[in-house]
Amino acid sequence: MNQWYFKSVETAAQHGALDDSAQNFRPNDNITREEMAVMLVKGLGYDNLVETAAAAASPFTDVTSNKGYINLAYDFGIVSGKGAGQFVPNGTATREEAAAMMLRCYNKMNSDTDFVHGFYAFSSYGQKDLAKEMDAVSFGWSKMEYRDDGSIVVNTLYENNNEWAVPEGYEQIVEELQNSGVQTNLNVFLSDATQAQTILNNAENRTAAVNAIMEEVTVTYKKLGRNPYEGVTIDFEGLRGSTLKQNFVAFLKELDTALTAEGKSLYVAVHPATKDGSYYDGYDYKAIGEIADKVIMMAYDYEAKNISADVQQSGFTTTPVSPFDQVYYGLHAITDENTGVTDSSKVVLGMSPSSNVEWDLQNGVIVNSQGIDNDYDTLQTYLQNGAKSEYSEKYRNPYMTVRDGDTTKVIWYEDSRSIQDKMDLAKMMGVNGVSFWRLGLIPDENTTAYSNIWSTVK
């Protein structure tokens, strides 16, 4: 091939955008809409998501081949239908259509992160300068509780074994962030399933919960001389079932009405949908999106926490902390045009940069049934001392191997590559907001290669 386009075609083939199994390029043939979609998805490097995408329902009734590629291209907003549920895969892609597809690709790939949020909780003050660069921060200073006497309180004190409390010297960080133009929210945490049912499944209790929250976000904090909160972030975790789903929405509607009257905003943290279907399904994404100002999808805690004796014996250690296909599945669900958040600008991708899990092997057998969680400094020390690090293109997560006598440690973790990959995928799905759990744990130094995670959002 000596034609003018040879180098471009060769480069495209080398990067997987073209099927190099074919013997001929057929340069004079017209390209079909299906071929164009496949080529663009391959060129973007998302082949590893095709199987997951193919399992989803197609918006088109006439797609019989390359369903995963076309579904992905549709999710990315690269292609659209021809009306009446038709994609017309074998139709010729006109020059106009090809140009439009490529322009959409370019715009998505080069879009900016337009919203950065962080959770501020335990030992977060050390990263106050990072917090000042964010658009909003949620202070993890309260926990919702249903007391034995039937009262519902927003506990902000270190009583009743509560670690979600207002710290000494709170006024300093509030002043610094607000002077920097950062929105400050009160994060209201609840993870007890029984208490969630008691509070949400009773109309009087829902109202009592709303009143307790409103009291906390309107009362004057003495050392500050005013209330520190410009909004509320609801972080009710572990909700399951249709009853809780419905009543959680009722609670949010009531809370939003009260907050709006005070000129305050509402953020809601939600669990992501997962491929196996066994996830926390008590979150009506569409309804929540209509109520909340921001919806934070917590795309973390995917990794195995405990393993069975059989798995230990097998020596199976492939437990990425944020598998790429799972993150895609969650983003697909929360941006679904029928059941997801209608306005994708409200959706925020939540990530946990310090997440990691370690499995220790001896003679090919895993000796710990419970995953080990390391602090990031320990991981950096391992890498500095010669630990072997690899990057899984399938899961888009790094993992390292550490030799310690007769023990081999296998550790899955996050780094700037895995965070960037998730952010890039989210942008392709129309999600340009990110959130971090949590300040104090965001790697922001160039200790080793790919260690400066904060650099991905600066």
Give the location of each predicted region.
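Conserved, mostly hydrophobic/aromatic
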Residues: V137, I234, V295, L349, ...
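Substrate-binding surface in catalytic domains of secreted glycosidases
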Residues: Y146-E168, L244-D377
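Feature responds to low-complexity, polar/acidic, surface-exposed segments characteristic
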Residues: M1-E10, Q14-E34, L40-Y69, D75, ...
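Glycan-binding loop/region signatures in secreted carbohydrate-active enzymes
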Residues: K346-V348, P353-M423, S451-V457
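Active-site groove signature of glycoside hydrolases
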Residues: A212-N247, M297-N306
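Short, acidic/polar
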Residues: F119-E133, N202-G225, G277-Y285, E414-K427
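Acidic/aromatic/glycine-rich contiguous surface patches that form carbohydrate-binding/processing clefts
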Residues: K422-K458
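Glycan-recognition patch characteristic of GH18 chitinases/ENGases
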Residues: D112-I213
